[in-house]
Amino acid sequence: MAKIKARDLRGKKKEELLKHVDDLKVELSQLRVAKVTGGAASKLSKIRVVRKSIARVLTVINQTQKENLRKFYKGKKYKPLDLRPRKTRAIRRQLTKHEQGLMTKKMQRRSRLYSMRKFAVKA
């Protein structure tokens, strides 16, 4: 089997991709048997190509799965941890902009009664 391109795989359904992976795995096992029994050099070099092809198909499956999950959870309040943006622990614990702007009743009263003084500079 020739080297496959990821862009060719993206349009296919998951069942087709899984069947493709199974076919590639069967081919890989045949190539490994040929390696043990002393097969041709062309077959030995093909092992690497087939392994990479399997990885490529599985990568496309995982990417499409994650993309569908992102669409499903878009706009929802809670998301799975692996779909949330990656941040450090300290950043996750910071106050939000809204929380930073909140004031107690006492602070609101104080800012209303004693607002910031404005001075005019006489030139």
From Swiss-Prot:
- Per its UniProt record, what Gene3D superfamilies does this chain match? 1.10.287.310, 6.10.250.3450
| Keywords, in A-Z order | Cytoplasm, Ribonucleoprotein, Ribosomal protein
Entry's localization field: Cytoplasm
Entry's InterPro entries?
Ribosomal_uL29, Ribosomal_uL29_CS, Ribosomal_uL29_euk, Ribosomal_uL29_sf
Q: Main localization of the protein?
A: cytoplasm
Q: Which Pfam families match?
A: Ribosomal_L29
**According to its UniProt entry, what is the function of this protein?**
Component of the large ribosomal subunit. The ribosome is a large ribonucleoprotein complex responsible for the synthesis of proteins in the cell.
**Subunit structure of this entry?**
Component of the large ribosomal subunit.
Q: What is this protein called?
A: Large ribosomal subunit protein uL29
Q: What broad taxonomic lineage does this protein's source fall under?
A: Eukaryota, Metazoa, Chordata, Craniata, Vertebrata
